[in-house]
Amino acid sequence: MAKELVLREGSSAPGGLTAPRVTVDEILARLDRGEQIAFVDARREQEWRSSSQKLPGAVRLSPEGNEETLPLIAPDRAVVTYCTCAHEASAAKVAEMLMARGHKDVHPLHGGFNAWREADGPLEPRTTAG
C-alpha cells in the first residue's frame, strides 16, 4: 500500500475534488527512500514544447483533455502532477482528472517544474513524444 503524501491545507482542484499540494523537499525525500512515484507533466502545450527537460519518467497529460496516457499510470501508484502556471492550476486540473478516474494518491507539486529545477531535482531530456 502506498504511503500518504504530506498534504498542504487549503488546496483543492476545481470541481471540489481535493488535490493537496506537496513540496519538492517532500518528494525528493520520498525518492531518496526508494519510493516509486509517477510524475505527470501537465504543462500547457507552449511551455511543454519550449522545454527540453521533464521530471524523471514523466508522462504528458494535457490539461486540455488529452487522456491517451491515462492507461500508463497505475491507479494504485502515487502520482505527482506538475506544471509551470500560477498556483499549479494545470497540475490541479490534471490531478482532478486522475482522481475522477479512481486514482487516490495524486498531488500537484507546489511551485511546479520551476521549483523542482531550482531545487536541483533530477531531470531528464524530454523527447518529442513526451
Regions found by a protein language model. Give the residues of each.
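Flexible, polar/low-complexity N-terminal or interdomain linker segments that lie immediately upstream
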Residues: M1-S50, E124-G130
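Conserved beta-strand scaffold positions in the cores of enzyme catalytic domains, especially
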Residues: R21, F39, A58-R60, V106-P108
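Structured helix-beta-strand junction loops
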Residues: R33-G34, D76, A119
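Short phosphate-binding/catalytic loops that engage adenosine nucleotides
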Residues: E35, G102-K104, G121
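Short, flexible helix/strand-to-coil boundary loops that buttress conserved ligand/catalytic motifs
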Residues: S52, D120
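Short, structured coil segments at secondary-structure junctions
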Residues: K54-P56, G102
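Alpha-helical scaffolding within the catalytic cores
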Residues: P63-E68
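Catalytic cysteine-centered active loop of the rhodanese-like fold, especially the PTP/DSP P-loop
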Residues: L70-W116
